[in-house]
């Protein structure tokens, strides 16, 4: 009897060992789920890319993303460097890649205080507005039917609690009129494109209310605006997912779409932190993963209001955070590591 029990126990242990080994091997070969498929019933999944890196990221882009944003190639200094001179080549490469692979394209951006040549601001207010109208006609017209959404105006709001619009030539010379006209002219050129106001730190209550006020004024005047873009450049300390939810709820009161347009989560607690990690610390990757998890729980909760989430990059081997705010500092803000493998943050947002 004892021998029989012992034999059964040994057999069970063998079976258990075999099963665990099988499961381990199965897990090794487990298919990595496609982000765009996981979220196909919620919102588009996008990435900011360059014409120089789309083929470097080709496999990741085709599998996981269904929307692309040109990181710099549609900004004024690149696409319209001189009066009456347009260079659509770099942006066209991205748009063509997207079209061939069934992806949408977000246009970024028509009015911004950075990366705009100085000649744009020469002359009178009327001359500047006429120059902008011509720019919008050419750029939006060139991509009509290919770009489904535009960040028409980018970062117009001041970070100073006592100021509304930022101090920049567009607004110092033209005031809020330039914002209104930009949306009106973009809509005239492509009535089917969705038009967004886009800004950073919109999770902050003060800046949130500024954005609410701006968009409400535009809507009250009948200006065509369809959405607000929350950029979403986070650190491990700020903002909180709850702040994101508060902003989504507030903007939803305006009856507009909300998109997270430039999402990334730095592994630093402070934007100017002195550390420079050559290898990301595990505890920081854990914190990053938790923040992504909580953020996406909120984004899914507001399905129908949140219509798109775009990451500002594809994988950790290239991020704008290498250059700003601390030049040369390594960072690891995205869902895929430098070898293009999914990080813990990736698995946290696909498990639901």
Swiss-Prot record:
Q: Name one GO biological process term.
A: xylan catabolic process
| Catalytic residue positions | 155 (proton donor), 262 (nucleophile)
- Per its UniProt entry, which superkingdom is the organism in? Bacteria
Q: Does the keyword Hydrolase apply?
A: yes
Broadest EC class? hydrolase
Residues of the GH10 domain = 29-352
Query: What family is it from?
Result: Belongs to the glycosyl hydrolase 10 (cellulase F) family.
The name this protein goes by in its record: Beta-1,4-xylanase
Can you name the source organism?
Answer: Dictyoglomus thermophilum
